[in-house]
């Protein structure tokens, strides 16, 4: 093993960890993108840097200067809410990872989830699995957009602490935003690229 890491703190804005290199040196590091999966990515990057001869200080500086990219775990803070913009693409594993990030937030948690593409005959079951996971994580409100999210919404609605709503398309959800999104909400926005969810992010920013 080139190195190890110890998770220290996570929140919806960032994560911190301690990275220990093979030579025994260690350093505290702030990963400016939220999520334990992003910490794992940072550790992988640190391993590559160490192998290439970078110092601990250089590795730390590189990780901590990681830019936030729209559509990829990008945090947007407005006057009314925090938006977790992870809408570039989606699959069942990344959906669950994004729900985990949302679950770090303090306050009401809303997951706006759209179709996941290219799942073939397993699409209905895998969307349902994500809905079950959202309910298990006690997401307060799950909004499914698109035909494939019907099973997701159905399963999410079975959660004792989860409300679930289904919308046929982006436009119908956008029209409902003033009625369902509240001041102080934390809102995850995620779907496959073809769903054009940047449109959803923009509408939330305009609220």
Residue ranges, per PLM feature:
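Short polybasic amphipathic segments
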Residues: 15-20
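ATP-dependent carboxylate-amine ligase
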Residues: 23-24, 28, 34-207
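Single conserved hydrophobic/aromatic residue that forms the stacking wall/gate
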Residues: 1-12
